[in-house]
Amino acid sequence: LLNILCGSIPLDGGDVLVNGKSIRKQKDFQRYATIGRVYQNPSLGTCPNLTMLENLSLADNKGKRFGLGFGVNKKRIDAYRAELAALGLGLEDKLDVKMGALSGGQRQAVALLMATMTPLNFLILDEHTAALDPKTAETIMELTGKVVRGKGLTAMMVTHNLRYAVEYGDRLLMLDHGTIVLDRAGKEKEATSTEELLQVFNRYSIL
């Protein structure tokens, strides 16, 4: 589903509408201008040989016409520091550190920030905590909820952690071989428990 949204997999039929407009025929660069994505692998979505400052600057200029006016200046550096400080991980003092030297959790936190620096139609979270240890995964999920709600974003998250789905999701979809087998929102979603989701999951996983 995510790859269809991003254009990596062509549609066999139907259409993809974003804000009521079809994006089926859009080129990849056109789609990504208003789509943010955080990948499962912390090594993706950032440039390991560039500093955090350089990575943030690239993300900040996404979809913009480049020119001398888009270089890093003190005002931008101060803004990046403020954004990083808001994450509460002490990253604001590591702007000159290369991304490859950061831990997986730190990289995912920066990747989340980078993915949401410019205006978005929606944010894709592609199992973005799956490669992290449990404690770090909890931290990244808390940050994700804070960023998504703080910026008023529409986000689509793929996860095998059913508790995360129930705790953070406003609408729950469960797919089995590309077919939606569960779709709950509103009061129905609020009444859904992790245990109930697990029962549905197990029902299809043994087929």
Label the predicted regions.
Residues 22-36, 66, 73, 189-197:
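ABC ATPase NBD coupling module
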Residues 6:
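Helix-to-loop junction immediately C-terminal to a conserved catalytic motif
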Residues 159-160:
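H-loop/switch region of ABC-family ATPase nucleotide-binding domains
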Residues 50-62:
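Q-loop/switch helix immediately C-terminal to the Walker
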Residues 179-203:
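Conserved beta-strand-loop-alpha-helix hinge in the C-terminal portion
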Residues 11-22, 184:
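Conserved ABC transporter NBD signature motif
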Residues 115-116:
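ABC ATPase C-loop
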Residues 123-126:
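Catalytic Walker B motif of ABC-type/P-loop ATPase nucleotide-binding domains
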